């Protein structure tokens, strides 16, 4: 049986500044209508980690054209793709899965999770 977060508070960020403190009276369960929002929260964690790593030059990403911004990950409704596999990505993905587990209170369904490599790896 997996255990999730037992006690937590919600702090809303409005216009870049923390506002208000909310103590939830009930938790979320699998199948709850709020479950999609859990995925969104976790992808925000992933995006933040990737953005910070790119700003530090540790996650280079790829360009789709000469003048385009660099892309290091893509998020879809039920899929997440990484543009380039580097040692840092090996650190970021487990954090993403851990955050999903903490928010949902359920372990990651590994048989339903796939990792594909395209091209050559270092």
Swiss-Prot record:
It comes from Arabidopsis thaliana. It is found in: Mitochondrion. A stretch of 270 kb of the mitochondrial genome is duplicated within the centromere of chromosome 2 resulting in the duplication of the gene. The expression of the duplicated gene (At2g07697) is not demonstrated. GO terms for cellular component: mitochondrion. This is Uncharacterized mitochondrial protein AtMg01250. Keywords: Mitochondrion.
């Amino acid at each position: 049986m997996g255990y999730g977060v037992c006690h937590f508070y919600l702090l809303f960020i409005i216009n870049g500044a923390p506002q208000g403190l909310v103590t939830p009276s009930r938790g979320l369960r699998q199948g709850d209508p709020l479950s999609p929002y859990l995925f969104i929260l976790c992808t925000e964690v992933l995006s933040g980690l990737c953005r910070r790593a790119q700003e530090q030059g540790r996650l280079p990403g790829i360009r789709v054209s000469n003048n385009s911004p660099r892309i290091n990950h893509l998020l879809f409704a039920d899929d997440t793709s990484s543009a380039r596999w580097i040692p840092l990505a090996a650190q970021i993905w487990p954090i993403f899965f851990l955050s999903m587990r903490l928010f949902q209170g359920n372990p990651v369904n590994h048989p339903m999770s796939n990792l594909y490599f395209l091209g050559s790896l270092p």
